């Protein structure tokens, strides 16, 4: 079983069948915020692989002896996007437009749980507009849930992963990666894995060939880190 950060939902659901076709192994995914999955792993959830939205949570698990030695790899870098859902009347083409009166509700994943939420707020602070708009923010448990605020008409603008809204319609504004710390999508194999060979194959799949092609398709920046 693969614990995967919420931003990876669409990409992993696309690459899952490709991995199965190549290896004969059927991957089962559990998607949630990186912090929530880390907590589940600390409480002995039966995962084989953890694909996180940062490296810090894997550092934490590594220090506690919960990762298989030498199994970590940065497989991509995530891109934050501002999404104006179809039907939203907010005239937003760039982040600075969020200060306009037409933007009443902005959905963001909780920064203490989701690296993408933390990165979004970092970008807004970098632009000097966070203090002007923070009273309009509503916080979701993860970026999938933040997206749902917009899809249901309960938010005028949403900060989420570019990968989740690339094909969602509306207006998608990728946030300049220079405005926030790199989002190193990092995978590792759990020391408690009952299927370490299959886990190694999945992590390897993310680093080459068809796996990397899917990540590229969903707008991830392909990492040269390992």
Regions found by a protein language model. Name each.
Residues 1-31, 35-45, 52-68, 73-78, ...:
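Exported/periplasmic ABC-transporter solute-binding proteins
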């Amino acid at each position: 079983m693969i614990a995967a950060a919420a931003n990876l939902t669409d990409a992993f659901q696309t690459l899952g069948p490709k991995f199965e076709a190549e290896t004969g192994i059927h991957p089962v995914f559990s998607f949630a915020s990186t912090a929530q999955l880390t907590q589940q792993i600390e409480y002995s959830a039966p995962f084989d692989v953890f694909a996180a939205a940062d490296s810090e949570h894997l550092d934490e698990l590594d220090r506690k002896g919960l990762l298989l030695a030498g199994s970590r790899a940065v497989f991509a870098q995530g891109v934050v996007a501002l999404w104006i859902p179809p039907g939203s009347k907010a005239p937003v083409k760039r982040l600075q437009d969020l200060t306009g009166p037409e933007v009443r509700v902005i959905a963001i994943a909780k920064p203490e749980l989701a690296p993408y939420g933390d990165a979004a707020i970092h970008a807004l602070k970098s632009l000097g507009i966070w203090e002007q708009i923070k009273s309009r923010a509503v916080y979701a448990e993860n970026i999938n849930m933040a997206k749902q605020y917009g899809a249901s008409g309960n938010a005028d603008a949403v900060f989420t992963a570019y990968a989740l809204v690339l094909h969602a319609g509306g207006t998608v504004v990728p946030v300049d990666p220079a405005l926030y710390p790199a989002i190193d999508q990092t995978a590792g194999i759990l020391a408690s894995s009952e299927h370490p060979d299959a886990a190694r194959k999945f992590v390897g799949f993310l680093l080459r060939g068809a796996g990397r092609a899917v990540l590229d398709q969903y707008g991830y920046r392909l990492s040269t880190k390992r």
